[in-house]
Amino acid sequence: MRKRQGSALLEFAIATGILVPLFTGTFQFGYTLYVYNNLQSAVRGGARYASMRSYDSPSATPSSGFSSAVKNMVVYGNPDGTGQPVSRGLTASNVQIQPNMNGAAPESITVQITGYAIDAVFTSFTFNGKPSTTFPYTGTAAPHP
């Protein structure tokens, strides 16, 4: 009987050593997926907003007003840039806007997240170019002289 007294404690230590990292990894994977889905929804909303907003630049470089409104839409969920970011640590510098031009007007607008990092327990995940969404442009392009 004396030889069996420590076996339960030993089994508990081994099981804990395996289960704690397993549960931590599962939690972190779930949290990363949750954040990615929030970012995907924000990017989709920003691309939808950009596809309907008047494009006021004659080139593939959007005007500062257009860019800031679309970036605010992605980061804050509104073009004014008020409130809390949709995801902790997300800033306007993490949002890229790429109009795909057809002459003087965009044919489509691509919005994506770049350089956004999620800190995990053992490492860090950085999103570069993902999530990304492209919408066909349905707004009006302002005429330029």
Report residues per predicted region.
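N-terminal leader/signal peptides at the extreme start of proteins
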Residues: 1-5
